[in-house]
Amino acid sequence: MIKFENGYVLSKDFELIKDDVYVKGDSIYKIGKCDEKADSVYDLNGNLLMPSFKNAHTHSAMTFGRSLADDLPLQSWLSDEIFPREAKLESRDIYDLSMLAFLEYLTSGVSACFDMYYHPDMMAKASTDLGFRTVMTSGLNNFCESIQSVEDYYKRYNSYSDLISYKLGFHAEYTTDKNLIFGISKLAEKYEAPVFLHANETKTEVEDCIKRYGKSPTLFLDEMGIFNYGGGAYHSVWVSDDDLEVYKKRGIWAIINAGSNAKLASGIAPVSKMLKKGINIAIGTDGPSSNNALDMFREMYLIEATQKLNDKDAASTDPIEILKAATIGSAHCMGLYDCDTVAEGKKADLIVIDLHKPSMQPINNILKNIVYSGSKDIIKMTMVNGRVLYENGEFNGVDAEKIYYNAQKATDRLK
């Protein structure tokens, strides 16, 4: 059992308290006084223990494309640069490239990612080998996977390990024909399960869908029954008031990817409007080919900054709400209700924020500091499922240089 003492704790109510926290096995055992003696003591030294970040949308294995094809609009980037390289990917590549992404997540205080990509067997193996938590979903489209494979994955990976789970999904309306979309809708009905996909990312995507079906992607997919049990829409940039009414009615998560949307010039999601309407918000980075970082601090700051610019209002969004979205919101979006907060009985997915870094001083408002001036530099420790995987700039239990070598080797073959 590990005892965390002598520091701040961000409680389940998102309040700063000063209490001891005991972690036994993979879970938070006790907050406050405990009669049992700890096996080891972690002296927080005045730092902050808080729930980890959860990356609610990414394509981890796309590390191969980082700074390989930049400064292009989305469709050109996908069609001319990404899809041809993805066609060359082998299953082992997914393992090696994902491992690289997992290391980067840990440096950003991320304990779990929501990943849409190919070869889920390799993704699950990499995640389990490292001890990282991964929620997977299907990238089903007109060119890969099938309704049967999605159902097989859904059944297999929801009983694979404590660290792995699987959600129904498909790539996007514009890459997936109506019959396949209907097939996913039937699976959602069969399992009473939410569905996740890219939606409303670019203006062109929305306009093309209106030409095809006479309505926006949100309204079309809702008509197809995709959101009968909720789900999530990655990006959610070009959304109308009618779309947002569907989000609210169906409990659809708006999964915001500010860095990727800015870099690809896709637009700015109306997060402030969504929050005012009571729409669920989660935060992800998107993939390392389009962002190009897997950094939740950058995402939080970009959301705050772009909302203020877009609304011409310095008080447009509350940074504390954005911090909640990156932790609790993203966890709930991913179905990770058992590791969302620092509370007894919850899984021990925890991070330590170094309050002794210059960017975190002076201490006026710790939580606002995390959003406005925080960076990876302030992550002192990342714990996943009760195991410390990253601490003081070092990865525990893995050979980082070997992971870098294998990822570079896979990338060189795809060029």
Regions found by a protein language model. Name each.
Residues 1-19, 24-25, 34, 324-415:
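Active-site microenvironment of metallo-dependent hydrolases
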Residues 66-131, 151-160, 407-413:
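Alpha-helical scaffold segments that flank or form the walls of functional sites
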Residues 64-96, 130-138, 203-230, 250-253, ...:
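Active-site gating loops and adjacent loop-to-helix segments of metal-dependent hydrolytic enzymes
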Residues 123-240:
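Metal-coordinating catalytic core of metallo-dependent amide/deamination hydrolases
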Residues 7, 21, 26, 46, ...:
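Divalent metal-coordination and catalytic microenvironments
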Residues 223-230, 272-357, 373-376:
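His/Asp/Glu-enriched, well-ordered alpha-helical/loop segment
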Residues 241-242, 248-279, 284-285:
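A conserved active-site cap/scaffold subdomain adjacent to cofactor or substrate pockets
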